[in-house]
């Protein structure tokens, strides 16, 4: 997964090579001409139909990644608190469906 969090941190070719392209909301993303999806659209590398909106993934209207080999390009925009809220919802849905893998990020956290 490649997550583009600013206007110029991704080459447009990353979008073209992705098997799944995800953004928060297409109308918001496509209006920012310096962002990777808008540049890929202008270059004819993708169409609107190639892009999945995050709400469609969360609501289950799009299956998302269908194999471990797929490359995902994600371009979240907005406030970090929105990302936390979306992540919490995705986590609860994955937990409900019995999906995902629990990761141990630290063996002995230094802050506890």
Kindly give the residue locations of the regions a language model identified.
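Aromatic-anchored, glycine/proline-accented short structural segments
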Residues: 1-18
């Amino acid at each position: 997964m490649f997550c583009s969090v600013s206007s110029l941190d991704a080459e447009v070719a990353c979008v073209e090579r992705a098997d799944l392209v995800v953004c928060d909301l297409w109308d918001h993303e496509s209006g920012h001409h310096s962002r990777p999806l808008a540049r890929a659209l202008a270059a004819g590398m993708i169409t609107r139909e190639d892009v999945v909106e995050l709400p469609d993934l969360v609501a289950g209207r799009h299956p998302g990644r269908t194999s471990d080999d797929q490359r995902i390009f994600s371009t979240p925009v907005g406030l970090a608190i929105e990302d936390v809220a979306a992540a919490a919802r995705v986590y609860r849905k994955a937990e409900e469906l019995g999906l995902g893998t629990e990761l141990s990020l630290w063996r002995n956290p230094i802050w506890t």
